[in-house]
């Protein structure tokens, strides 16, 4: 009889211990899920202002109007661009070097792998050469990409839509003045778009600063040595409203880069990001990443610094190192990011149709952020 009671007692203790373990695991999983989901910001008192249909109408208006004015101010022609390129061409953008492109094969073209573009940085430069564009002339295109490894939040989507642009310059124009003059032109077009949107949607438009402030990533590091690069960007952009952070990719005084950049398109000494302060999310909003592209010497040194000298054997890199490609300046301007900025939206999913975690969609809906 004692043995029976002992077994019952053991069973009860086992159930209690198992229950405690399950409770602990549930709590741990919940905490982990919350940490992953903490990237979502839900602004207090947020109101979408425009209905979904009004938002769709405004998106079309901004995109149609901006690309016409942008092309005119920058002397750029609209061209068609690929959705995917062959892996062996070396034309795809490696971004920070760790993002996995979406790849596939094609039944009618055996022994070749294709990748959905992550950007058109290298393709545009090759196209300018093939289409015989002269210095001062350029192109822009609608670029649609899938970035499967993006961390999804208010600003980041796995679907990327941007105006990719590129312009031929002379070798002697590869300098800071050319870069900053181009940045000022882009800022002027964006600022003018604020007025265009205000005429049609005065209740929704965000008011932008009148000027853009220039600073190098090293100057920014020295200004805020104890902050992370992202914290530095937030502090300087909040102070000035709109900032162009220059020289991104190379090691700074502390031995670390401000941010990652592929070694084979931007010259790390002649590039940067355009940032606007965005009150809805209390952070800097990157609208454009751009730069003067590598020449032969910059390509050599940056490939070496990135331990990527094996890329020299790819067709694009061979052509560039042989001096067969034009010198260029180029970049991308986020279409959804620009709509988000001008319409004062709190989530990029309010201005583009993409995919999101179900609990993010529900949380946004409860806070009047309707994802398309």
Tell where the protein language model's regions lie, with residue ranges.
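Short, positively charged and aromatic/hydrophobic N-terminal segments
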Residues: 12, 16-17, 21, 31
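Class II aminoacyl-tRNA synthetase-like tRNA-binding/catalytic domains
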Residues: 39-156, 164-168
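A generic secondary-structure signal for well-formed alpha-helical elements
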Residues: 70-77, 186-197, 346
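Extended, charged alpha-beta segments that form solvent-exposed binding/catalytic grooves
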Residues: 141-227, 231-234
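A translation/RNA-centric and nucleic-acid-associated enzymatic feature enriched
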Residues: 146, 216-372
